[in-house]
Amino acid sequence: MAYNPKILQKPKEGEEITIKDGKLHVPNYPIIPFIEGDGIGSDITPAMIKVVDSAVQKAYKGEKKIAWYEVFVGEKCYQKFKDHKELSPEEQWLLPDTIEAINHYKVSIKGPLTTPIGEGFRSLNVALRQKMDLYVCLRPVRWYGSPSPVKEPQKVDMVIFRENSEDIYAGIEWQEGSAEAKKLIHFLQNELKVEKIRFPESSGVGIKPISKEGTERLVRKAIEYAIDNDKPSVTFVHKGNIMKYTEGAFMKWGYALAQKEFNAQVIDKGPWCSLKNPKTGKEIIIKDMIADAFLQQILLRPSEYSVIATMNLNGDYISDALAAMVGGIGIAPGANLNDTVGMFEATHGTAPKYAGLDKVNPGSIILSAEMMLRHMGWVEAADLIVSAMEKAIKSKKVTYDFARLMDGAKEVKCSEFASVMIENM
């Protein structure tokens, strides 16, 4: 289907990324929609574009180039389109044209988004993922030489597949004292004979959906990633010891899928199993771990874990805990994916007190752009960004968050850090 925006202008140049036989086909001048983001978005996104354009130019000598196409969500969207009466209040923050563009052009990148204040407004990040069914939140975590609170951060090299569409993030909950909460509690107590609600008169209630289909499509992606990237293991992280029919089912369905679709064989008496990587012949172990024990293990034995598949809430905790071990969320990249669309993003917040000061670390969105280039098959440009990031940090010309933790560092601005990276390509 053609892209026919109602409010935005169509891109003036560039070509569309398409999908043929399940594979991404990327032209030499692809249109990439970008959302600048709120708060520090106006600092970090231009820095990212500068770094990406330089890496692409250096890698391909002008044969390839990105046609950047700005689309809008968040505060900037609201300020720009609040007088458009044909838009609902939600659409003034989350423009329908933007969703259509992200779906149509297949690959996009975004800065951090503020959540509108007021009843009925959800997190815009969550709304974007849910509207487009971007069911995988992909978070690679590795060390680039930045200051770290742990002794051996180089041992951390994990990729988290966090389920994006289910769990308590589905937002199915009711406030304490509301008619809906009272009705649901009454139903649970009287129809289902639930006796475990300790304070029924003053409880808010939420529902945690975990489905077989949602689990299978996430686990399938995680195992495919392990095969494609020659990883030694996939670990299901869950609290199935407590939540047997949701998180326990996630583990059970995960093992069943590995056996059914990837011919994984049970080790000893299970439940761990192993499969042979069809591309390399190496063994991939499929295992699981209780979430609280896993949070200990990533500190004590991080090198034993590689690809992680988990649900929404666990994935949120784990990805931020791992990010802290390698330099913090300011440098943590991420992406939201489904079978056809990839939306790459800065994983931190809008930090409004630093907005417009040209101060903060643009590392998260730059490394998310590196993921984006790799996803597009532009591996040479992606490799340039990784090596430039490592060299820039090693040179100790870094933004304030790293400079205060490094002896002999020279503090540079956000835009200057981008220039330091370009000098190191």
UniProtKB/Swiss-Prot annotation:
Entry EC number(s): 1.1.1.42
Membrane-spanning residues: none
One matching Pfam family: Iso_dh
PROSITE patterns, per database record: IDH_IMDH
SMART domains noted in UniProt: Iso_dh
Residue sites binding D-threo-isocitrate per the record: 123, 125, 129, 139, 162
Catalytic activity, as annotated: D-threo-isocitrate + NADP(+) = 2-oxoglutarate + CO2 + NADPH
GO molecular function, one term: isocitrate dehydrogenase (NADP+) activity
Alphabetized InterPro entries for the sequence: IsoCit/isopropylmalate_DH_CS, Isocitrate_DH_NADP_dimer_prok, IsoPropMal-DH-like_dom
Record text on cofactor binding: Binds 1 Mg(2+) or Mn(2+) ion per subunit.
Residues bound to Mg(2+): 316
Cofactor(s) named in the record: Mg(2+); Mn(2+)
Amino-acid positions noted as binding NADP(+) in the UniProt annotation, renumbered to this chain: 114, 348-354, 361, 400, 404
Enzyme class: oxidoreductase
Site keyed Critical for catalysis: positions: 169, 239
GO biological process, any: tricarboxylic acid cycle
Keywords, comma-separated and alphabetical: Glyoxylate bypass, Magnesium, Manganese, Metal-binding, NADP, Oxidoreductase, Tricarboxylic acid cycle
Source species, domain of life: Bacteria
NCBIfam families: PRK07006.1, prok_nadp_idh
Family (UniProt): Belongs to the isocitrate and isopropylmalate dehydrogenases family.
Subunit-structure text: Homodimer.
Function: Catalyzes the oxidative decarboxylation of isocitrate to 2-oxoglutarate and carbon dioxide with the concomitant reduction of NADP(+).
Name of this protein: Isocitrate dehydrogenase [NADP]
Gene this protein is translated from: icd
